[in-house]
C-alpha cells in the first residue's frame, strides 16, 4: 500500500508530465522554432534601421516589434496547421502534430490563430506604424491564404511562399524607419534567396511524405532531382551578390563583406555537395547530403545577420 506522500508525489509527477506535454503541443502548434527565426530576422531589420536613423535600437520599439511579430507568426502557424491537419496526418514527419493527432481541436486552433493574427497586427499598427502592421498582416495572409493551399496545386508555391517568408526583416526595418527603403529591400532579398536551397533540402529529405500527402513539391513532381539541384545551385550562387547588397547601400562595411563572402561560399559549397544526389543510388546517403545542406542553411543565416549587425554603418561592435 502506497503512503499518502508517495501518492502525492505520483500525482504531482503526472501533473508535471501533462503540463510538459501541453507546453510541447502549443510550441508545435505555434511552430516555436519558425517563430524564433522570424523574431531574429525582424530584430536584425529593426537594429539596422535604428542605427540608420542614428538612434539606439535597444528601446521599447524593439520589444513591441518583436512581440507583435511573434504573436502574428504564432497565429499564422496555428492557422496553417488547421488547414493542413489532414495532409499532416498522412505524413510520418507531421502525423504527431497536435491538430493532426486530435490533441488540439480545429475550432480551438482556428480561434487562437485568427485572434493572434488580428490582435498582433493591430498592436504593431498602433505601437509602431500603420505600414508595419499592414506588412505583417500581408505576411500572414500570404502564408496562410495563398501559399498553404497552393502547395497542393503547384510547385510554384515554394516561389510564391518565399515572398511572405522574406518579409520579416523588412518589417523590422519599417518598424524602425517608418518607410520602405532600399536597405530594407536588400534584407528582404537576403531572406528570399536564402530560402530556396533551405527548402529544397527539406523537400528532398521528405519527398516520399509529401508525395503521399499530395503536396506538389519540386522533388515530388521531378523525382530525378535535376530541377531540385538546379534551383538550389542558382539561388546559392545568387546569394553571394545579394548578401553584399547592404554594403553597396552603405548599411554595412568591408569587414561584413569579407565575412558574407566567406559564409556565402560555404553555403554554396554545401549546395554543390547536395548536387551529388543526382548520381547517388543509396537513399540514406542522398538524404544525408540534403540534411547537411539543411544544417548549413540554418547556421548560415544567423551568422550572416550577426555579421551585419556587428558591422552596421561601418561599426565593428554593437
Regions found by a protein language model. Give the residues of each.
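Small-residue-rich segments of transmembrane alpha-helices in multi-pass membrane proteins
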Residues: 40-43, 97-98, 118, 160-176, ...
Amino acid at each position: 500500500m502506497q503512503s499518502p506522500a508517495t501518492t502525492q508525489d505520483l500525482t504531482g509527477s503526472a501533473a508535471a508530465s501533462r503540463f510538459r506535454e501541453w507546453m510541447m503541443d502549443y510550441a508545435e502548434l505555434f511552430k516555436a522554432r519558425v517563430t524564433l527565426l522570424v523574431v531574429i530576422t525582424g530584430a536584425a531589420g529593426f537594429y539596422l534601421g535604428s542605427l540608420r536613423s542614428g538612434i539606439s535600437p535597444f528601446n521599447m520599439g524593439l520589444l513591441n516589434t518583436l512581440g507583435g511579430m511573434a504573436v502574428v507568426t504564432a497565429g499564422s502557424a496555428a492557422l496553417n496547421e488547421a488547414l493542413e491537419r489532414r495532409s499532416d496526418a498522412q505524413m510520418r514527419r507531421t502525423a504527431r502534430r497536435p491538430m493532426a493527432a486530435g490533441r488540439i481541436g480545429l475550432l480551438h486552433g482556428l480561434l487562437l490563430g485568427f485572434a493572434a493574427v488580428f490582435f498582433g497586427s493591430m498592436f504593431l499598427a498602433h505601437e509602431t506604424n500603420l505600414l508595419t502592421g499592414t506588412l505583417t498582416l500581408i505576411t500572414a495572409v500570404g502564408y496562410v491564404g495563398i501559399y498553404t493551399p497552393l502547395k497542393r496545386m503547384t510547385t510554384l508555391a515554394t516561389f510564391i511562399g518565399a515572398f511572405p517568408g522574406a518579409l520579416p526583416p523588412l518589417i523590422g526595418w519599417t518598424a524602425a524607419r517608418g518607410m520602405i527603403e532600399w536597405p530594407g529591400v536588400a534584407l528582404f532579398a537576403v531572406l528570399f534567396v536564402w530560402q530556396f536551397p533551405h527548402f529544397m533540402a527539406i523537400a528532398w529529405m521528405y519527398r516520399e511524405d509529401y508525395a503521399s500527402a499530395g503536396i506538389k513539391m519540386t522533388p515530388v513532381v521531378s523525382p530525378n532531382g535535376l530541377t531540385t539541384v538546379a534551383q538550389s545551385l542558382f539561388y546559392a550562387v545568387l546569394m553571394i551578390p545579394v548578401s553584399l547588397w547592404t554594403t553597396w547601400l552603405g548599411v554595412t562595411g568591408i569587414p561584413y563583406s569579407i565575412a558574407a563572402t566567406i559564409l556565402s561560399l560555404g553555403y554554396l559549397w554545401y549546395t554543390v555537395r547536395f548536387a551529388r544526389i543526382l548520381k547517388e543510388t543509396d537513399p540514406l546517403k542522398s538524404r544525408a547530403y540534403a540534411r547537411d545542406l539543411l544544417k548549413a542553411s540554418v547556421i548560415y543565416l544567423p551568422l550572416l545577420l550577426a555579421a551585419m549587425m556587428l558591422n552596421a554603418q561601418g561599426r565593428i561592435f554593437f
